[in-house]
């Protein structure tokens, strides 16, 4: 299969290149950038010398359609809604890593992203690509989930799909490494601001909130809202999500573990930790794994769920490739069989 990557110079695009380089059934046909053409990626990223030798090209839909079977769009939100349409119309596999097609309600997108929304027709064609819970595996147009949404939804899914949560009790405390802010530097991501520091940002206003709610209410329509906070922590990669919920009825620790283990029994990239063991960000670094730890406090009737992912892999490029594997009927783990980098 031939693929093109639009937005190849960003962190998401770079991860797609790294992972697809190991894929047994995929060849990268073309790489595209808005900011640089004619240069090779190695010009900007020396670690890719002799690996990414094709020049970066401007975006030419006719050429991309002619040369590729699949298009990955790894651009900031607000771009894919305009550039993805020709590839969808041509019947190519299209996987968008931005937020442009995730929300089915155009008004919600415009409220939370502050940009004009994609045409209704195309929003309707896109399937939300939470890989472990995809319903239409033959779909060729995927809205890849956000990093916070992936960690949160995988953490809540076993309880939410079985309608076991007290619907007003969900509290999510999510923390992200600096790469989650993207490649373009800013004052808030400057080393002197982030080193030895932790910053709360977008309190009650993060754009992944409606995305999470859209999926949660699909599983359990009684959930009215979530309390969701996001923080920036001084690590390069990783999402560390701590979720607190109350079950509708008391549950034992063993019942809780059994529920999660049975839900993810056939999910190659979700690993449930043993009882009283909680995951760290480092144990999933540079991998497509989501590791989940669980605890139940009988005194307070509170379940604590710890869900960790690499924001650039399971939270972006890795899940995008996992979605490609599902739609193309490849082995789900092809191109993703990476042992996490440690230490």
Swiss-Prot record:
Keywords for the protein's UniProt record, in alphabetical order: Amino-acid biosynthesis, Arginine biosynthesis, Cytoplasm, NADP, Oxidoreductase
Organism: Listeria monocytogenes serovar 1/2a (strain ATCC BAA-679 / EGD-e)
UniProt xrefs under SMART domains: Semialdhyde_dh
Active site: 147
Function, as annotated: Catalyzes the NADPH-dependent reduction of N-acetyl-5-glutamyl phosphate to yield N-acetyl-L-glutamate 5-semialdehyde.
Protein's UniProt name: N-acetyl-gamma-glutamyl-phosphate reductase
Alphabetized PANTHER family for the sequence: N-ACETYL-GAMMA-GLUTAMYL-PHOSPHATE REDUCTASE, CHLOROPLASTIC-RELATED (PTHR32338:SF10), N-ACETYL-GAMMA-GLUTAMYL-PHOSPHATE REDUCTASE, CHLOROPLASTIC-RELATED-RELATED (PTHR32338)
A GO term from the CC aspect: cytoplasm
GO biological process, one term: L-arginine biosynthetic process
Stored Gene3D superfamilies: Dihydrodipicolinate Reductase, domain 2 (3.30.360.10), NAD(P)-binding Rossmann-like Domain (3.40.50.720)
GO MF entries: N-acetyl-gamma-glutamyl-phosphate reductase activity; NAD binding; NADP+ binding
Family membership: Belongs to the NAGSA dehydrogenase family. Type 1 subfamily.
Pathway: Amino-acid biosynthesis; L-arginine biosynthesis; N(2)-acetyl-L-ornithine from L-glutamate: step 3/4
Pfam families (UniProt xref): Semialdhyde_dh (PF01118), Semialdhyde_dhC_1 (PF22698)
Cellular compartment(s): Cytoplasm
InterPro entries reported in the protein's UniProt record: AGPR_AS (IPR023013), AGPR_type-1 (IPR000706), NAD(P)-bd_dom_sf (IPR036291), NAGSA_dehydrogenase (IPR050085), Semialdehyde_DH_NAD-bd (IPR000534)
Entry annotated with the keyword Cytoplasm: yes
């Amino acid at each position: 299969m031939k693929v093109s990557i639009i937005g190849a110079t960003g962190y998401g695009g770079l991860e797609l290149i790294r992972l697809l380089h190991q894929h047994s059934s995929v060849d990268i046909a073309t790489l595209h950038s808005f900011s640089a053409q004619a240069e090779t990626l190695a010009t900007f990223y020396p670690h890719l010398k002799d690996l990414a030798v094709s020049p970066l090209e401007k975006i030419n839909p006719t050429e991309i359609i002619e040369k590729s079977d699949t298009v990955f769009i790894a651009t900031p939100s607000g771009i894919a809604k305009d550039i993805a349409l020709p590839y969808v119309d041509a019947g190519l596999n299209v996987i968008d890593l931005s937020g442009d097609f995730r929300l089915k309600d155009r008004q919600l997108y415009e409220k939370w992203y502050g940009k004009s929304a994609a045409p209704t027709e195309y929003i309707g064609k896109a399937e939300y690509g939470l890989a472990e819970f995809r319903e239409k595996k033959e779909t060729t147009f995927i809205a890849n989930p956000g990093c916070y949404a992936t960690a949160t939804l995988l953490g809540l899914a076993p309880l939410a799909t079985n309608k076991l949560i007290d619907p007003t009790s969900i509290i999510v405390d999510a923390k992200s490494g600096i790469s989650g802010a993207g490649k373009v530097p800013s004052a808030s991501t400057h080393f002197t601001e982030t080193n030895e520091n932790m910053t709360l940002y977008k309190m009650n206003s993060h754009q992944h909130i409606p995305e999470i709610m859209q999926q949660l209410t699909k599983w359990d329509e009684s959930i009215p809202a979530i309390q969701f906070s996001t923080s920036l922590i001084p690590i390069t990669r990783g999402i560390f999500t701590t979720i607190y919920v109350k079950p509708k009825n008391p549950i034992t620790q063993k019942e809780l573990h059994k529920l999660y283990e049975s839900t993810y029994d056939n999910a190659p990239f979700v690993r449930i930790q043993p009882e009283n063991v909680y995951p760290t960000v480092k144990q999933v670094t540079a991998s497509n794994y989501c590791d989940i730890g669980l605890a139940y406090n009988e005194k307070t009737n509170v379940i604590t769920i710890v869900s960790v992912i690499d924001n650039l892999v399971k939270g972006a490029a890795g899940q995008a490739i996992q979605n490609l594997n599902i739609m193309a009927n490849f082995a789900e783990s092809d191109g993703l069989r990476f042992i996490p980098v440690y230490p």
